[in-house]
């Protein structure tokens, strides 16, 4: 789970990008969820921890350039046991995104479902734009962490509930698809 945090919550605030991704043992990357939102820091921290538990993630990655130590403190207030790694951007967005763009070009990144707002940011963002591509930033951090070997592999087959309606894999404990709402016993 990766977070690109917004530290304010008003009409002009950016969203907090929160994206869940995984890597299979075959070297394929899966974008599993985008739970980005415009909310107060305590609310987005709860949302990130919720995604962490739902997807049984190894850790939460948070870009600290804007939020500093605040991200880790907020996450630990929600769940003291959450695994968190702070990352700091030392290069521009475009340079950070290039290796991830290469993974897409190689056909190694797959979106499980449709993430309209994330995909729109990915298609429309240019380096000269003033508005932050919060969802895309979170995606880049998630895939960068996975491609660097920083997190363990996932086995999508172990996520036994596969929605027949939208194709979203879900944890074994889920009774409904949280992407489209289909109940698994109705499939």
Model regions and ranges:
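RNase H-like, metal-dependent nuclease domains and their acidic two-metal-ion catalytic environment used
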Residues: 1-87, 109-163
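Conserved beta-strand -> loop -> alpha-helix junction used to position metal-binding or nucleic-acid-contacting
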Residues: 81-103
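Short Cys/His-rich micro-motifs in 6-15 aa windows
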Residues: 181-187
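Alpha-helical elements of the RecA-like P-loop NTPase motor core of helicases
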Residues: 69-73, 98, 178
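Short cysteine-rich clusters marking metal-coordination/redox-active sites
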Residues: 163-166, 177-180
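Residue-level signal for mature regions of secreted extracellular proteins and peptides
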Residues: 159, 170-173
């Amino acid at each position: 789970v990766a977070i690109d945090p917004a530290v304010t919550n008003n009409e002009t605030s950016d969203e907090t990008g929160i994206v869940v991704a995984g890597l299979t043992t075959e070297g394929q990357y899966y974008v599993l969820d985008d739970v980005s939102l415009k909310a107060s820091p305590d609310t987005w921290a709860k949302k990130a921890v919720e995604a962490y538990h739902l997807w049984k993630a190894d850790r939460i990655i948070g870009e600290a350039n804007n939020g500093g130590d605040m991200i880790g403190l907020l996450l630990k207030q929600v769940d003291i046991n959450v695994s968190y790694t702070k990352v700091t951007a030392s290069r521009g967005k475009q340079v950070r995104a290039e290796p991830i763009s290469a993974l897409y070009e190689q056909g190694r990144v797959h979106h499980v479902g449709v993430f309209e707002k994330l995909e729109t940011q990915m298609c429309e963002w240019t380096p000269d734009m003033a508005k932050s591509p919060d969802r895309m930033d979170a995606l880049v951090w998630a895939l960068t962490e996975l491609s660097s070997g920083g997190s363990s592999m996932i086995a999508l087959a172990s996520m036994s509930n596969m929605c027949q309606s939208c194709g979203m894999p879900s944890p074994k404990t889920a009774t409904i698809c949280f992407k489209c709402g289909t109940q698994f016993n109705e499939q």
